[in-house]
Each structure stands twice: as C-alpha cells, then as structure tokens.
Amino acid sequence: YYTPDYDTKDTDILAAFRMTPQPGVPPEEAGAAGAAESSTGTWTTVWTDGLTSLDRYKGRCHDIEPVAGEVNQYIAYVAYPLDLFEEGSVTNMFTSIVGNVFGFKALRALRLEDLRIPPAYSKTFIGPPHGIQVERDKLNKYGRPLLGCTIKPKLGLSAKNYGRAVYECLRGGLDFTKDDENVNSQPFMRWRDRFLFVAEALFKAQAETGEIKGHYLNATAGTCEEMLKRAIFARELGAPIVMHDYLTGGFTANTSLAFYCRDNGLLLHIHRAMHAVIDRQRNHGIHFRVLAKALRMSGGDHIHAGTVVGKLEGEREVTLGFVDLLRDDYIEKDRSRGIYFTQDWVSMPGVLPVASGGIHVWHMPALTEIFGDDSVLQFGGGTLGHPWGNAPGAVANRVALEACVQARNE
C-alpha cells in the first residue's frame, strides 16, 4: 500500500495525514498500514482478496514527508480511488477515511489535515441549499457583511422574554439574531412557543425598519423526524432561516435538512458545536478545514469559522485559508495557509463564514478587513452587553459596520 511511484488521478480523493508513528515503526510502514486500513486492507491476508482487483480499489500512500521542526512527525499523502465511496454521502466518506485508522496501534497520533475532493465526487452532493448570492437576493442586502447576535443568556429565558430580546436587536439594526446552539426544546422554553414569539418579533421589526430580518431558529432535535417537523413549522410561520448543529446532529441529518431547505426556500445556518473535540489537538483528530469542506458538501448557507480576534482559538492565515475554502470556487494549494491541495469546487455555491465568539464593536475594523463583505459578524455579548441595553447595542454595531464600509469605499 506504500507506492511512491503512483501518479494520482484527477478522480482520486486525496488526503494529507499528519502522523506520529510509535517509536521504532518506520513511517513508510505506518503510512501503508493507514492507507490499507482506511480502504481494502485488513490485518492479515484473506482468501477473498483473490476475488477482487485490489490494484483497482486500494488506497495508496504515495508520498511521505517529515514535518519541519517536529520530531518523528510526518505528513503522509494517501490517494483513494473514487469507487470506494458512496455518492452524495459525507457520512460514508468519513466512515471510510477516518473510521478505523485513528485507533491504530502502530500510530501514536494521527490527524487528518486536508482532503482534496475531486469534482467527480463533489458533483454528487447537494452543497449549500442556496449559497451566498441567492441569500443576498433573498435578503436584498449587498456590499457589506451581515450582522448577527446570539441571544443571551443562552438558557433560562421564557419564550416571551426571548422574543422581546430578538425584537430589540433586530429593531436596532441587526440583520439576524440566533438561537444559541444549546437551545433546542427545554422545559423552560418549548420550541413551538419560541418559534411563535420569535416570528412575531421578526415581523414587527421588519415592518418598522423596512428591512428583511431573520432569526436562526434552531431545528436540531433528538431525531431526524422531529428536526424536520421543526423546520416545517418554521417555514409555515414564514421564517427565512433555520439552524442546525451539524456535528452533534450528524451529517446524515444535516444533509436531509439541507434538501428540505433547498426545496422550501429556507436558508440554513450551521453551528459547529463539538468541533473543538475533533480539531483542537495539534497532532491528533481532524483539522477544521476538513470539517468545513464536509459541511459545504453536506449543505449549509452559513457556518461558524472562528474570529481571529475574539475569545476562541484561531490563527489568522489558517482561518483565512478555510474561509476561502468555504466561499471561493477555486482555491490554490498554499502550505503557508495549511492548504495541502488545490481544491476546485466547480460551480458549487459558497458558504458564508460566520465570525462569532467574544467579539465586540471595537473589533469591527479588523473584522471587516479580515473577512470582507461575504461574511456574517455575530456579536452576542457584544450587543446584549451594551450598558444601555440590547437595542442601543445593536445600533452601535450597525453604525460601526456602516462606518467601516463607508471608510473602505471612499
């Protein structure tokens, strides 16, 4: 399974793994074992190998390079033939590529750094339900980032007070407010009550400001059926957008919801709760840029992508790398930004990156410069923490944004 002379095909799915072999295990052996375990191999030779063409179906570790400045760490490049994967299933792709190999004895640690998805495969996915351009047309908002706000305290408000907070923020000038990812349907606020009060707030703010407003109604639930029930109710109320936690909810549920949203004209906001469990470690897990690519294939119109400046972790160049992977059609390989492969999305719509987490109005110049127009800037405490209240907090954010955009345009 270690084939250094292999030339990759345009249809191969390419993976870059950062591997730390156990002491005494040569990197070639570790790379080959990983390629085997995540494709056709098993721990021994079996009779039934003779009944198929392993040359056609096996994953190949075709290049290994040491990581600069690290002891006993290597980047292993593995190519997988397209036939190993079910079309249109992120779930199956991850089950194959990262399903078993991370528990391997020969490896002390393993991290999936990047994936190259060939157009032949990405074309089998729904992708974002609408994409950036359609969203701007639906909202009739152009030439500036969109503003959001997560309603806090995240848990404990009654539905009516929650609706009031939503109204104040939207009335003050925000484009969106957001259910916190933990808000599903708890005893103090059942989902249907929340949806009803929020819809009222939405239409009242819309009527008073003459702008289209949205609130990310969190449809995440314990079962797929319940999730779709909530999305359907949101659509019946006339809400423009719903929300889903794609890692805790799972890719299967997420893709089902994306299909529903596309068919019914709902935008889909994606929250990445649980991502740090998977991507925080430097040498083990899956890098967020892979999770971001997976989301673009599975379907979502917004996704949280770190801030570069707030309370949560994120390095600037690397963050910008996966922001481009979310928005652009064609992204060149660039190792300085952690992009191991050139990625061609052909015509798959883009996803709006959402900057959220510990940012406030003083960060606005930096945020508009870093993220550009196609983004959503979300201030939770940065709106509701205003000493004069929610609406003035929203006004402050909107004024700051307009000022930054005007300064840039002049």
From Swiss-Prot:
Sorted UniProt keywords: Calvin cycle, Carbon dioxide fixation, Chloroplast, Disulfide bond, Lyase, Magnesium, Metal-binding, Monooxygenase, Oxidoreductase, Photorespiration, Photosynthesis, Plastid
Note: The basic functional RuBisCO is composed of a large chain homodimer in a 'head-to-tail' conformation. In form I RuBisCO this homodimer is arranged in a barrel-like tetramer with the small subunits forming a tetrameric 'cap' on each end of the 'barrel'.
Subunit structure: Heterohexadecamer of 8 large chains and 8 small chains; disulfide-linked. The disulfide link is formed within the large subunit homodimers.
UniProt PTM comment: The disulfide bond which can form in the large chain dimeric partners within the hexadecamer appears to be associated with oxidative stress and protein turnover.
Protein's name in the database: Ribulose bisphosphate carboxylase large chain
Binding residues for Mg(2+): K178, D180, E181
Cofactor mode of binding and number, as noted: Binds 1 Mg(2+) ion per subunit.
PANTHER family named among the record's database cross-references: RIBULOSE BISPHOSPHATE CARBOXYLASE, RIBULOSE BISPHOSPHATE CARBOXYLASE LARGE CHAIN
Top-level taxon: Eukaryota
Function: RuBisCO catalyzes two reactions: the carboxylation of D-ribulose 1,5-bisphosphate, the primary event in carbon dioxide fixation, as well as the oxidative fragmentation of the pentose substrate in the photorespiration process. Both reactions occur simultaneously and in competition at the same active site.
Active site: K152, H271
GO biological process, one term: reductive pentose-phosphate cycle
Subcellular location, principal: plastid
GO molecular function, one term: monooxygenase activity
NCBIfam families: PRK04208.1
Coiled-coil segments on the chain, per record: none
Annotated residues for binding of substrate: N100, T150, K154, R272, H304, S356
InterPro entries: RuBisCO (IPR033966), RuBisCo_large_chain_AS (IPR020878), RuBisCO_lsu_C (IPR000685), RuBisCO_lsu_C_sf (IPR036376), RuBisCO_lsu_fd_N (IPR017443), RuBisCO_lsu_N_sf (IPR036422)
Organismal lineage: Eukaryota, Viridiplantae, Streptophyta, Embryophyta, Tracheophyta
Cofactor: Mg(2+)
